[in-house]
């Protein structure tokens, strides 16, 4: 059985540059890792009170975003854009102790 994680990125578009918004949009969509049987759904919006995450850092040069849950800021996530079909997701504690290996996800069509 697949584990499904919803990530609702909450941010104010008026405070971001066009390049930063474009960078975030690279990650919007449905992604899956068939080997680990994990799927993630990344979207923008605060239309739900569940699974809300705020963006901590946007690295437009490396197409990377760092974010954490609004409910639990101790764990941070890093998304790296690999290509149009693949992203990498890595988790770590806010103090930087205990960083996980990146997990590769493939875009679901």
Swiss-Prot record:
Protein origin, superkingdom: Bacteria
InterPro entries per record: Protease_inh_b-brl_dom, Staphostatin_A/B, Staphostatin_B
Keywords annotated in UniProt: Cytoplasm, Protease inhibitor, Thiol protease inhibitor, Virulence
One Pfam family recorded for the sequence: Staphostatin_B
Localisation per UniProt entry: Cytoplasm
Residue span of region Binds to staphopain B: 97-101
Record's keyword annotation contains Cytoplasm: yes
Subunit structure as annotated in this protein's UniProt entry: Forms a stable non-covalent complex with prematurely activated/folded SspB.
Protein purpose: Specifically inhibits the cysteine protease staphopain B (SspB) by blocking the active site of the enzyme. Probably required to protect cytoplasmic proteins from being degraded by prematurely activated/folded prostaphopain B. Also involved in growth capacity, viability and bacterial morphology.
Miscellaneous remark of the record: Inactivated by staphylococcal serine protease (SspA).
Family to which the UniProt record says this protein belongs: Belongs to the protease inhibitor I57 (SspC) family.
Protein name in the entry: Staphostatin B
Gene (UniProt): sspC
């Amino acid at each position: 059985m697949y584990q499904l994680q919803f990530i609702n990125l909450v941010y104010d578009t008026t405070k971001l540059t066009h390049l930063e918004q474009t960078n975030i949009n690279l990650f919007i969509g449905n992604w899956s890792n068939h080997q680990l049987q994990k799927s993630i759904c990344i979207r923008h919006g605060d239309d739900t009170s569940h699974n809300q995450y705020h963006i901590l850092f946007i690295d437009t040069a490396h197409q990377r975003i760092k974010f954490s849950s609004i409910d639990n800021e101790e764990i941070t996530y890093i998304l790296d854009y690999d290509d149009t079909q693949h992203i990498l997701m890595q988790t770590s504690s806010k103090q930087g102790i205990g960083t996980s290996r990146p997990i590769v996800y493939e875009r679901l069509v």
